[in-house]
Curated annotation (Swiss-Prot):
GO terms for cellular component: cytosol. Belongs to the methylthiotransferase family. MiaB subfamily. Gene3D superfamilies: Methylthiotransferase, N-terminal domain (3.40.50.12160), tm_1862 like domain (3.80.30.20). The gene is miaB. This is tRNA-2-methylthio-N(6)-dimethylallyladenosine synthase. Residues 378-440 form the TRAM domain. PANTHER family: CDK5 REGULATORY SUBUNIT-ASSOCIATED PROTEIN 1 (PTHR43020), MITOCHONDRIAL TRNA METHYLTHIOTRANSFERASE CDK5RAP1 (PTHR43020:SF2). It comes from Citrifermentans bemidjiense (strain ATCC BAA-1014 / DSM 16622 / JCM 12645 / Bem) (Geobacter bemidjiensis). [4Fe-4S] cluster 1 binds at C14, C50, C84.
Amino acid sequence: MNQAKKLYLETFGCQMNVSDSEKIVTLMKGMGYQQTQDPVDADLVLLNTCSIRATAEQRVYGHLGKFKSIKKTKPGLIIGVGGCVAQQEGEKLLKKAPFVNLVFGTHNLHLLQGMVAAAEEGKRSSQTDFLDDEKRFDLFPHSEAEGGVTRFVTVMQGCDNFCAYCIVPHVRGREISRSAAKVVEEVRALADSGVTEVTLLGQNVNSYCSKQPGEPDFPDLLRLVAQVDGIERIRFTTSHPKDMSPRLIECFADLPKLAPHIHLPAQSGSDRVLERMNRGYTAQQYLAKVAALKEACPAIQFTGDMIVGFPGEDEAAFQDTMALMEQVQYADLFSFIYSARPGTKAAEYADDATRAEKQGRLERLQAAQKKTTLARNRSLEGTVQKVLVEGLSSTGDSLFGRTGGNRGTVMAGDPSLAGRVLDVKIVEGLQTLLKGEIVHD
């Protein structure tokens, strides 16, 4: 009896990459590969990479060095690199890392099976061509990942915003939206398989179908998905503040299934920096959207992104960012030191702050956010939250789920409760999660 081939897959970066990795698992399963959590056991190692910051690229090359060592003792090991670093580097990656067998870009998952088959025959290859818009979703494979009650559903790909610091339009391509009918069809199929929560994915979901007049826009799509029986909760990410329309804000008031949480990246609180970033809004316009969302849904929780040390940011601009954070009161915040990316407008800007200054600002920002996050979590103590149970916690001795506001919560209970939305009384708010008790009738 032939032993099943083993796949080790490592994913870096955003939720779109996580979604793409689910598709990769499905494709490789079709070739007889089963997943393993140990690269030493693998016959095929694939990295799905991120290039949003230089540190992400450096991590990829660091990991490749680890797999190179494994390949020395296992010459038949196939190593492949996909995602945004692969899209950016292309064949150069094969030259930099001659032990890599294949490189596949963000538009080339439909070619992956053929590339792996060629690698099994000893052939190296690189595929990073962008697909035409009309072909992109027709050729892009779908995930058939098994298990779990939450799932990502891609509704659009690419980005047309060209923020000065961002490489996404260069490695993911221009915006293209999937038809509403196809999205709803996938959501129905997921609901039939036991999924109870879907997250609608795109680099900028707010501009869904903006280039396709006559098609449902994103608020319309949310209302269509909310009609699918079996789906208890809907999330979406990521949102661009400039495209947060009144009709989309109304959805938070009108749709009980829409989770009271939004990831709304500000990136800076300084109007001067926001203009240099080409974000398309001022700090006051951003705060007006936040206020409108809070009015529509008083329980809404905000998460976001902030960049510190962007060219032109001085101490006054940084203090503007701190002031915006204080007004919004983010439940959580992803924050980073600016990293110049090749081909972007900001790469041409003079870098006018020292590394020590940038690091100091980041540490001050993160310390302030840490206090806010803990305070917000503690403010939930004694309240009853709607928690969608996802399954066992990482320790295996309790259940794990998320509140509507996207706060991770652990509680005692039977694993059969996975997929249910339960009333949970929060007994303790910690830095990174909540502890709760299921409220029984």
